[in-house]
Amino acid sequence: TPLAAREPPVAPLEVHQDEEEEEDEEQLPPLDEEPIREHFQPLTPITEKTEVTRRTDSTRSSDAVRTPTVARTPPAERRQRTVDERHAEGAETEPAPVVRPPPHGGLLRDPAELGLPSPCSPVDPDVLGALLRNLATPLSHTGCFLDRQSVGGQGLLQAVRKHACKTRARRSSVAGGAQPWALHVEDMCVGIHHMLGEGGYGAVFLAEDLDGHVPLALGQASTPVEEDDIDEEERRRMLALKVESPANIWEFYLLEQLQHRLDASLRSSVVGVRRFTAYADESLLMLEYGATGTLLDLVNQAAAAGVASAAPAPAPGAGGSSGLDEVLAMFFVVELLRLLEGLHRADVIHGDLKIDNCLIRYDPLREGEAWESNYAADGSGGWHSKGVKLIDFGRAIDLRCYPAHQTFLSDWAPGAQDCIEMREARPWTYQTDYFGLAGIAYCLLYGRYIEVTSSVGAEGQKQYRIQQPLRRYWQVPLWTRLFDTLLNPRLASAHGTLPITEELGAVRREMEEWLAANSFRAGKVCVAPVYGVADQQNLKGLLKKVEIWALRA
């Protein structure tokens, strides 16, 4: 039975102080609280209904992203410029007057002056409205932003839902499938193929740029396409169309910020924006389309792809699979560790890090480049082109927009996929991403959702660990350190402070060293039952099998 997605249980929200409990051992509710997972919904960048708070007019009006007030306090040390600078050059033909840069790194006022509660919900519409109004440069000045907030969307979400194909085609046969329904949006004509996923306030559809008017994402535009590369041209025509009502401006803002804050080597690991249209009551977010599926898809189909772990599969009715080969699982974990370090250095918390929000990434090699067999952590030898692409930033947090030491509290009903602090109604910051990554690593290894237990240490501090023992033939010290660090981040820090970026970097480097030494293991041969691919289980061979599986799925 494949892993199943489900709505988290609804529970009243109470705030408790962060204090240690005097108990010897406590088992927390596992991610598979329900005994049997009947069905797993395919990937969708839309979060569940309980994860989204409705936006108000404060984020949709024409003045939503500007304010005439200019703060008089000196700039904070940690603030950096946060606005889109792609259109910083003016079009004036005459010399323009000297304009001083915003005093707070792209913000009009010091966030401490906004009067935000701490803790607060990161999806509270009043909070998001205040943050957007405090931006020094309106988002409407961004090149891929179409500001139509003075008019309504005229029921676009309902219309697209009505005409989208009910049957989901194979990823490999989309281009030659049924004729899509044409949706005209401003100067663009977009063909709607079918729904990819649905949430409480919107849905995601597979769409196609029919007239070539949808701009490419920054990463796509920087990669040249050969004239005879028909497959790549078709892939570029495809896009993921996220339609929401009310309009969701915040996710667009975060995605645009990351394309300027992240190191160039990490930008391809975050889904790129192609065009965003904001109406008074709806929004259309056009994103890169990931045709190779998600890590969760791969876990559920690991045996068919020929990349499953040698461990026996779970008992019938238990849900899940046997997980991935350890080498392949560690490769994806390293990619996510590197990306998470980059996000946190950019002062961004993803807030909804889970395995079905991780697309498998296969980028084209550079001209004249060959993919080497031996793993290279620095991305050389073609290894930069393989990895993950993170999606769904609807709950993401830009810490540069908040006062220092800001904490957060969930106003949605937390589920077993959420971090311990959320489930215990305690304030949190980076913990949500750490627990999310632990859950992904666990699922890659075991083929099912994470289960954790807790115990009280010698100094009276509660410590969390995974419930399932690590298999003896795995790299037990490496995985133990990873899970201990992610599940107990304050204990991993020398001073009990967050984030623990350096500590995670140390774990990542150890894993990279092991991969470099063991990425070309000999002697173990596996034949994929569906595709008949026989290859030694080295890392490059495993990734080739994943690519073949993705193309034929």
Describe each region flagged by the PLM:
Residues 382, 424-428, 435, 439, ...:
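Helical subdomain adjoining the active site within ATP-dependent kinase catalytic cores
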Residues 193, 198-257:
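ATP-binding glycine-rich loop module of kinase domains
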Residues 389-397:
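Activation of the activation-loop gatekeeper triad in protein kinase-fold domains
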Residues 1-133:
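Ser/Thr-rich, low-complexity intrinsically disordered regulatory regions
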Residues 98-193:
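Juxta-kinase regulatory segment immediately upstream of eukaryotic protein kinase catalytic domains
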Residues 269-327:
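Conserved structural core of kinase catalytic domains
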Residues 332-333:
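Activation segment signature within eukaryotic-like protein kinase domains
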Residues 340-385:
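Catalytic-loop of the protein kinase fold
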